[in-house]
Amino acid sequence: MGLVVAGAAVLWAAALPAAAYAAALDSGPAHLFTLAVYGFGGAICHQRDDRSFHLFAEQLPVCARCTGLYAGAALAAVWYGSRPRLTRVSPSTLATAARWLLAVAALPLAASVVYEWTTGDVPSNLARAATGIVLGAAVAHVILAAVDSTR
């Protein structure tokens, strides 16, 4: 199950630039792929042009922060799958560690959002993506550790 979750994270992260490339091609079969990825991206993200990265002269299917979340999840999935198995820990220890990891990883993103709301100044897309990478990696790590602990 962990392999499925990790594979899904990597595939979705890879689909984002692939969809931008397919949109730039503007051809038949690639068009369906583009519609699917941008459609799903639109269901989970605001897709604001000014808050999105552009690749191949096309806006990515999700904003910079979401791109960071998914890239972080994919990186964590690859890292998690490549490391040796750790010894089992109790569910309560795992839950406590997960809560702390997620709280600490969410701090940069939360600080960025609070800064944006209180000043009206918008951080750069690179800064938005960086905060997403941290939280995305932590979330993926927690999910994969939880899936791994059930085996």
Label the model's feature ranges:
Residues P84-T96, R151:
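Membrane-interfacial, low-structure loops and terminal tails that flank and connect transmembrane helices
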Residues A22-V62:
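Extracytosolic (periplasmic/ER-lumenal) interhelical loops and adjacent juxtamembrane/interface segments
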Residues G2-A30:
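N-terminal signal-anchor transmembrane alpha helix
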Residues A8-L16, S92-T118:
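Small-polar-interrupted transmembrane alpha-helices in polytopic inner-membrane proteins
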Residues P17-A24, V113-G120, I143-A146, T150:
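Transmembrane helix-loop junctions and nearby membrane-interface residues
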